[in-house]
Amino acid sequence: MISVKDVVNYNPEEYKFKSREIPSDLLAIIIYAYMQKVKDLGSDTTLYEIGYEVGRLVSPKSYEDIKKFFEANNIGYIEIKEKDNGEVEIKVKDCIFCRTQKSEEPMCDFEAGLIAGFLESIKNKKYFVKEMYCQAQGYDACVFIAKPLHN
């Protein structure tokens, strides 16, 4: 049986974003339209779950891998800070999905799931990630808090 990972065939060492093939602004518009359609159907959870699965498939080994993935794919520039209580704070500047949008609420459910999948791959434990602040709300960055889940 072929796995999704085989189909994706992602290799971080060889992967390069081909911005000439799909301009990042066009990709952002396409993804935004998709996200809005899913939200209109009342399923923010679906976006989170899709992001989570993508994060697990990419399977980074370090925070540096996450930073490289975000930058190589023009998603944004990130800062990652571990807190004493076990939480992880992730700040995404110049977020491709919301930097040109306006919203009263945080809107980056896909990225929250993506970060949860990334952290699970790195730390070997599950996290729940919530976006606290979003560029679409007028903040200078999207800020996510990742809380470890206890079994």
Curated annotation (Swiss-Prot):
Q: Which Pfam families match?
A: DUF2507, V4R
Q: What top-level branch of life does the organism fall under?
A: Archaea
Q: Which InterPro entries match?
A: DUF2507, NO_sig/Golgi_transp_ligand-bd, V4R
Family affiliation: Belongs to the M.jannaschii MJ0150/MJ0739/MJ0745/MJ1460/MJ1642 family.
Name the chain's protein.
Uncharacterized protein MJ0739
